[in-house]
Amino acid sequence: MAARSQNAPTIDSTKNDSTVSTRKNVFNASVNYVSRLNYLGRVDSLKSSGVFPVISFDSKTGLYATGTFIFTQNSLQPLAYAGTSIEAGYKFPESKHFSGNIAYSKFLYTNTADIVQSAVKEQAAVNATWKNKYVNVTGGAELRFSDQTDIGVTGTLDHLFIFKLTGIKKSAIAIDPTAAINAGSQKFVQTYSKKTGGILGGLPGTTQTTTQNVNQFNILDYEFSVPVVFVIDKFYAALTPAYVMPQNLIAVSNKPELSETGSNMFYITATVGMRLEFR
């Protein structure tokens, strides 16, 4: 999750349970700033931040494509290009109670990119949301492809509040308190030593070192966020404070390069963007 961009909320709504509105072609462009880069709460040791220009096009057929340009900076490096991610997918017809999508992503990082998730080269995902007046429930699953394949699942609860502004045409403020949990497979090498007892005659015992491949499925993080989005006509701005709590960090003895770093952390995502609709 290189960038956590926030789209403009939908101001119009309907009361029926059919398709919410006739689909339109939508072009979206935004710039996102993330104060502390993380991937499921995992961070690099340099406390990097990032800037992510994003462009996307949603076809009225449901097909869509998104390109994200990744720039990172930290105490040892000024803002520099680190890679590009490309996502293509299909959004299911949206109704009063359902929305969802399937997507495939390709990540193209530079050789010098120091990003926690840079080992992931491709990803396939499916997400579905059940919407009601109390809480929206989202579930998702994904396959992450690197030197090996990992499975991830996510669950999210949120409730969207939209306040239309009087005196300003086509404007609103949206607040969307959100709680999320992410789980997935973890594959790593574990080495441990076992000492055997001495034999008769007083000879010392021996120490045997054993290495094994470990494949586990664990909770990876909990995250709480409160996106606040301001929309005026075709333009929008968002500020998303978030608190992430990583779980089950991998620690490999004497191999820090194979270990994960992370702790409970607060960070902010800021977004400005433009959304254009046309038939």
Locate the predicted segments by residue.
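Bacterial Sec-dependent N-terminal signal peptides
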Residues: 1-14, 272-279
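Short glycine/proline- and aromatic-enriched beta-strand/turn motifs that initiate or cap beta-hairpins
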Residues: 9-72
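Short loop/turn motifs that connect adjacent beta-strands in outer-membrane beta-barrel proteins
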Residues: 16-25, 93-100, 134, 162-175, ...
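Membrane-embedded beta-strand positions of outer-membrane beta-barrel proteins
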Residues: 29-31, 55, 65-67, 88, ...
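Transmembrane beta-strands of outer-membrane beta-barrel pores
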Residues: 33-39, 59-61, 69-73, 104-110, ...
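Short sequence motifs at beta-strands and strand-loop junctions characteristic
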Residues: 45-47, 78-80, 118-120, 147-149, ...
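Detector for outer-membrane/organellar transmembrane beta-barrel domains
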Residues: 131-211, 222, 226
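Outer-membrane beta-barrel "beta-signal"
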Residues: 157, 262-279
